């Protein structure tokens, strides 16, 4: 993925960067694998706001992605590499030998015409999915399952990849993108390679309106609100927070306070916590 810069013809364009989409080979998705996607505006089924800063944005269609990669022993060929508005990674349409078509996350260096296959007997090749027990130590993987057969849940965003560090006692040790080292059952599946679209992290949004196209609304600081709206609000002029530690709009500790549940069952599987 290459990045395009603009001449500073306006304040919004001055720092803006966009992808050239050079690797995209199709402009329209494969209709049978597309579903309607209803916008929530951050509201739940009671109409109450549960996630702030959501709303608006361009209309999207959901592409059904095969995270399970459970079509064993049947080779498939990459038909297209496509843009997906619902994630940072690109997706690849796979034509399988039995006639079925599925979308998968497009790994780095996967090209149209390449062959991919799933199953314990698959080769160690970019785009192939197999159990961690069959993958050599040191390999970069993505779309990693947490429970066998549930489908990939870890290392799915653009540029993400987990490194297989070791195998012992029925578990594989993975170093995740966050720096966390974690045990995962050897029977869990992963896809070989790193997720593509590596330059995603270097994209500069450039202007507020582009955030609105993505369905992200403005974030207002609590310190500029009124006391009725936020614990940091109120005061004459530019007043400080006025507390020992910053808090959320609901009075819970914010900015650095740990939010992970204590004595969580998965704690015993985490060998080294994520980087601060």
Swiss-Prot record:
Top-level lineage group: Bacteria
PANTHER family to which the protein is assigned, alphabetical: LARGE RIBOSOMAL SUBUNIT PROTEIN UL2M, RIBOSOMAL PROTEIN L2
Basic residues: bias regions: 258-276
Family statement: Belongs to the universal ribosomal protein uL2 family.
Name assigned to this protein: Large ribosomal subunit protein uL2
Region Disordered: start-end pairs: 225-276
Primary gene name: rplB
Organism: Moorella thermoacetica (strain ATCC 39073 / JCM 9320)
GO cellular component, one term: large ribosomal subunit
SMART domains: Ribosomal_L2, Ribosomal_L2_C
GO molecular function: rRNA binding; structural constituent of ribosome; transferase activity
Any one Gene Ontology BP term: cytoplasmic translation
Subunit structure: Part of the 50S ribosomal subunit. Forms a bridge to the 30S subunit in the 70S ribosome.
PROSITE patterns given in the database record: RIBOSOMAL_L2
Function per UniProt: One of the primary rRNA binding proteins. Required for association of the 30S and 50S subunits to form the 70S ribosome, for tRNA binding and peptide bond formation. It has been suggested to have peptidyltransferase activity; this is somewhat controversial. Makes several contacts with the 16S rRNA in the 70S ribosome.
Alphabetically ordered keywords of this record: Ribonucleoprotein, Ribosomal protein, RNA-binding, rRNA-binding
């Amino acid at each position: 993925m290459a990045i395009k810069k603009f001449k500073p013809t306006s304040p919004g364009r001055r720092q803006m960067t966009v992808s050239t989409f050079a690797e995209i080979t199709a402009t329209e998705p494969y209709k049978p694998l597309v579903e309607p996607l209803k916008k929530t505006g951050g509201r739940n089924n009671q109409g109450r706001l549960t996630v702030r800063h959501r709303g608006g944005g361009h209309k999207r269609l959901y592409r059904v992605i095969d995270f399970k990669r459970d079509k064993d022993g049947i080779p498939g060929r990459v038909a297209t590499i496509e843009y997906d508005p619902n994630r940072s990674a690109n997706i690849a349409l796979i034509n399988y030998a039995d006639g079925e078509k599925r979308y998968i996350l497009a790994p780095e260096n996967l090209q149209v015409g390449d062959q991919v296959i799933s199953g314990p007997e698959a080769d160690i090749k970019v785009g192939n999915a197999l159990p961690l027990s069959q993958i050599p130590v040191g390999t970069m993987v993505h779309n990693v399952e947490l429970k066998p057969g549930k489908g990939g849940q870890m290392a799915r965003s653009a540029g993400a990849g987990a490194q297989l560090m070791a195998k012992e006692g029925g578990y594989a040790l993975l170093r995740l993108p966050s720096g966390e080292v974690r045990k995962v059952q050897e029977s869990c599946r992963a896809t070989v390679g790193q997720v593509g679209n590596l330059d995603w992290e270097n994209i500069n949004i450039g202007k507020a309106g582009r955030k609105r196209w993505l369905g992200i609304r403005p974030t207002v600081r609590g310190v500029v609100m009124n006391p009725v709206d936020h614990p940091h609000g109120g005061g004459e002029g530019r007043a400080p927070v006025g507390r020992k530690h910053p808090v959320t709009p609901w009075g819970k500790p914010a900015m650095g306070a740990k939010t992970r549940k204590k004595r969580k069952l998965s704690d015993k599987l985490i060998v080294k916590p994520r980087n601060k």
